[in-house]
């Protein structure tokens, strides 16, 4: 569990790292004890042509440990900290035999893309965007899957901005990445951070007494999934992310809860990241499905497969949700043109 850095990062504190962290397209800065590796939305992952002095690394780690008042040495091998937009993880050289390891991940307080940019990037077909926007309007429960670094959280953040401001949203995270009050300014929101003495299960149970319309869990892991599905079963809506390589595997990823998945998870979206031979990175919606439990049978309706719209068949219970929300045509979002004009 990371500790929050009290002060905001400065160019002086982050030194060589800041040169890359200050670039909007950079998402990760990783140092493996010898080389500096950069993950860039446009250029992909590359080794930076930088010499990293040992003195700088020593000064940097000492600065971070002071900020969170935590020792970093042979006896305390892990140092983790957050700023408002950075998540920092450091492993001591006594454990990392290749040399001290530093990973810095950026989590910006804004949505990286607009609807127009997603269409230009071929993130998904326009009909799929319409469908997902209508799913938000209808209060569906979403699970965003993908491999680490695929862009699950960024995709979830993008669709969260379309939740109506009067609907109370509670976010639950260990490292602050969603920044809901920033991406949906003026909305009724409560942002919870779990830690010692207040774990995910505690936060989820406490949230139910806070009159939420939506309950957002940054990442679904182990025991907290049970509590999350229990809350979703009460009529609270929500988003979460999970490590996954196929939406059809979701029921198997969450043990002993197969029927609840089909009953209380409505939409699963798989985000895929690919890299071309010239190093260009592309992220896109590879799969989209609806889960449904019909006549005591569990069913999966694949809507998008291999990045292409393959079916327009909507389960009856999902169609009912659309109808109750005033959505007559699931693949046509009546607010889409307005969202485009607003630059969302």
Description of each model-found segment:
Residues 1-16, 284-344:
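NTP-binding/hydrolysis catalytic cores, primarily Walker-type P-loop NTPases
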Residues 4-27, 68-75:
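Phosphate-interacting basic helix/loop segments used at nucleotide- and nucleic-acid interfaces
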Residues 37-138:
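P-loop NTP-binding catalytic core
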Residues 144-146:
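Hydrophobic anchor at the beta1->P-loop junction of P-loop NTPases
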Residues 149:
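Walker A (P-loop) phosphate-binding loop of P-loop NTPases
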Residues 152:
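Conserved lysine of the Walker
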Residues 158-264, 272-273:
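Switch/coupling sub-region of P-loop NTPases
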Residues 259-295:
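Phosphate-binding/switch region of NTP-binding enzymes
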């Amino acid at each position: 569990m990371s500790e929050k850095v009290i002060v905001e990062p400065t160019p002086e504190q982050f030194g060589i790292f800041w040169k890359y962290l200050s670039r909007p397209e950079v998402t990760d800065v990783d140092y493996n004890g010898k080389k500096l590796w950069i993950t860039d939305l446009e250029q992909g992952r590359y080794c930076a042509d930088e010499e990293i002095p040992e003195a700088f690394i020593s000064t940097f780690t000492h600065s971070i440990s002071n900020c969170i008042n935590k020792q970093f040495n042979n006896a305390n091998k892990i140092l983790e900290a957050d700023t408002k937009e950075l998540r920092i993880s450091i492993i001591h050289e006594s454990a990392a035999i290749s040399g001290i390891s530093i990973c810095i991940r950026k989590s910006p307080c804004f949505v990286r893309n607009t609807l127009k940019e997603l269409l230009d990037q071929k993130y998904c077909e326009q009909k799929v965007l319409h469908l997902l926007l209508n799913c938000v309007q209808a209060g569906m429960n979403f699970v965003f899957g993908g491999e680490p670094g695929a862009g699950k959280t960024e995709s979830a953040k993008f669709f969260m901005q379309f939740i109506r401001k009067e609907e109370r949203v509670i976010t639950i995270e260990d490292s602050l990445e969603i920044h809901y009050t920033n991406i949906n300014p003026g909305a009724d929101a409560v942002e919870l951070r779990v830690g010692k003495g207040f774990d995910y299960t505690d936060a989820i149970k406490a949230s139910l007494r806070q009159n939420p319309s939506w309950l957002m869990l940054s990442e679904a892991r182990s025991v907290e999934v049970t509590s999350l599905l229990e809350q979703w079963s009460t009529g609270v809506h929500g988003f979460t992310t999970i490590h996954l390589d196929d939406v059809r595997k979701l029921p198997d990823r969450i043990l002993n809860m197969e029927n609840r998945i089909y009953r209380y998870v409505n939409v699963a979206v798989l985000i895929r990241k690919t890299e071309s031979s010239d190093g260009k990175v592309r992220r896109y919606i590879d799969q989209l499905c609806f889960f449904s439990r019909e006549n005591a049978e569990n069913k999966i309706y694949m809507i998008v497969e291999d990045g292409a719209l393959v079916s327009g068949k909507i389960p009856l219970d999902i169609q009912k949700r659309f109808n109750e929300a005033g959505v007559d045509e699931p693949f046509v979002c009546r607010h889409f043109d307005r969202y485009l004009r607003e630059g969302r």
